[in-house]
Structure formats: C-alpha cells, structure tokens
C-alpha cells in the first residue's frame, strides 16, 4: 500500500508533496514538512508554545533551516512527530544532525528575534510505523529551558476539546497554497474537529491511507480550503486553549473530503509516559 503523505518535505518530495499523500515537513537539500493553507498571520506573542525545528546544515539558511514544527509542553520538552526525524526527511540518521535546534519566540523566520536552542535529547516513538503513520510522535529535550509562560497544556483523554464540531486552530510556517509557497511568518488556520466516522470514511485504507482513531484525530473545513500542508508537520492543533493534535499526514492540502490527520495528544501522553 502506498504510504500516506506526511506533511514534511524532502528534496524531490518537496516538489510533489502537495499532490501526494505524504507526511508534512519542509523543502531544500534534505526533506521537510508542510504549511498552513487558508490561514492568517499568528503573532508568536499569542502562541509562544509554537516552535520551529531547524537544521541549516540539512535545509539551508533561507528560512533559518526550518523543516518542521513542534510545540512546547514543558520548559525543556517539545512534542513533534516521528516522521520529521526520519532518514527520509533528514537525509540521514538524526544522530548525525549536528545543528538540530528549536526556534522559539520568532514570528518571521528570517529575523533574529527569539531563541535558537540546541536539542540535547531526541526520543522517537519505537512503535511508529512509517507505512501507516501510526504512532507518529517524537519528544525533544532542550539544552536550556523556555519560560513556563511558553508552555501549553495538553488535553487528556475525555477532554471536551476532542468533541466533534469543536473549533480548533492549526499553526505552522509551511505551504500556504498547496503549491509550494512557504510562509515567511507563523500562520494559523481555523478548522473543526471532525467525527471519527467521517475521518474513517475519508481514509478507509489503500492509497489514501488508514485512519486509526486510537492514536489519530482529523480536522478540517467541510467546505475545503483550510488545512495544514507541507512544512507544517509536528505543529500544534489547539482547541479550547489546550493541545489536542500534532500535524501528521493527509491527502493534498485543503481538499474537500480529505481532512488533515493529526497525532492524538491524549494517546501521545501515554506513548511518551515518563518522557514529558
């Protein structure tokens, strides 16, 4: 079965990700993830927990080396997705990326505001399955702490924020059109959490991917046009002030009937028990 398209970009992948079913990362020498389609600028002062993953060595300096997103859930802990740290995205093992950093407190990637904090520890969910994107989770440990005010609470199992119909916002620096136009500043798009039954109909298996409600949730705009996209992978989906999802995969960007699929944070908390 062809692998669902993640929202991270890589060399050749960066040219075709908008039309394929792949994980969401960003363009340039290696591979990276997607951006927010149909959104608007989102001042980082209002969303200080939204961070960018960076490696200038692997992705060049034009966008500060940004290739994926992440979210601060503790002063030294960043949640992102496993496919952002895979060899396909990075062009080699993550252990060989000597300049892996988290960019925090920066709206425009070309600016020098905020902080670029080296990553001192990487944990990738050992149960992650690249063929299905199940278990798409990684935890980064920072070499120095962010302020507590830059941390977002995580929605646990049973939280009302997961209810179908709930308004949510997805954040990223990824593709804003689905055709390779990357955002220079952090953006967000308003979507809604969709029923698991609708997600399962959209992704029943086969070429379009398989939706698994135990570790995934999906969200989108029923009319299409608003979604995460390439370069947004690992970025936050936030509802009622709490983190409910991480950008993971989808079919295209903003298509009617093809909602974005996210790692379910209540499941991530269990997978990463003791590491957050």
Per-range role (PLM):
Residues 5, 51, 72-86, 98-101, ...:
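C-terminal subregion of chymotrypsin/trypsin-like serine protease catalytic domains
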Residues 78, 84-86, 108-109, 129-131, ...:
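Solvent-exposed loop/turn segments at secondary-structure junctions
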Residues 117-118, 133-137, 143-222, 265-267:
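Chymotrypsin/trypsin-fold serine protease catalytic domain
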Residues 47-66, 145-153, 187, 195-233, ...:
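Active-site region of chymotrypsin-like
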Residues 39-44, 128-130, 208-210:
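Conserved, non-catalytic sequence blocks in retroelement Pol enzymes and Pol-derived host proteins
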Residues 53-56, 81, 86-127, 204:
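Conserved H-D interstitial segment of serine endopeptidase catalytic domains
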Residues 2-79, 87-95, 101, 215:
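Protease-domain processing segments flanking chymotrypsin-fold serine proteases, especially trypsin-like
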Residues 60-62, 110-111, 129-132, 161-162, ...:
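Short glycine/serine/proline-enriched coil/turn segments at secondary-structure junctions
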């Amino acid at each position: 079965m062809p692998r669902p398209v993640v929202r991270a970009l890589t060399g050749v992948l960066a040219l075709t990700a908008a039309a394929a079913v792949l994980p969401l990362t960003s363009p340039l020498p290696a591979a990276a993830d997607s951006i927010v389609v149909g959104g608007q600028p989102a001042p980082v002062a209002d969303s200080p927990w939204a961070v960018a993953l960076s490696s200038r060595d692997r992705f060049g300096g034009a966008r500060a080396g940004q290739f994926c997103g992440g979210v601060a859930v503790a002063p030294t802990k960043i949640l992102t997705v496993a496919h952002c740290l895979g060899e396909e995205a990075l062009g080699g093992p993550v252990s060989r990326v000597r300049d892996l950093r988290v960019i925090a407190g920066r709206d425009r990637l070309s600016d020098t505001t905020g902080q670029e904090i080296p990553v001192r520890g990487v944990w990738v969910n050992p149960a992650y399955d690249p063929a299905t994107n199940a278990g798409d989770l990684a935890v980064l440990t920072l070499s120095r702490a962010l302020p507590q005010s830059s941390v977002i609470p995580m929605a646990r199992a049973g939280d009302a924020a997961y209810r179908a119909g709930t308004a949510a916002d997805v954040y990223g620096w990824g593709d804003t059109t689905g055709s390779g136009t990357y955002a220079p500043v952090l953006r967000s798009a308003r979507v809604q959490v969709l029923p698991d039954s609708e997600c399962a109909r959209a992704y029943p298996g086969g070429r379009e991917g398989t939706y698994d409600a135990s570790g995934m949730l999906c969200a989108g705009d029923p009319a299409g046009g608003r979604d995460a996209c390439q370069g947004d992978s690992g970025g936050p989906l936030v509802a009622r002030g709490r983190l409910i999802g991480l950008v993971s995969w989808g079919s295209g960007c903003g298509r009617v009937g093809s909602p974005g699929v996210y790692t379910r944070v209540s499941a991530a908390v269990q997978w990463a028990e003791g590491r957050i």
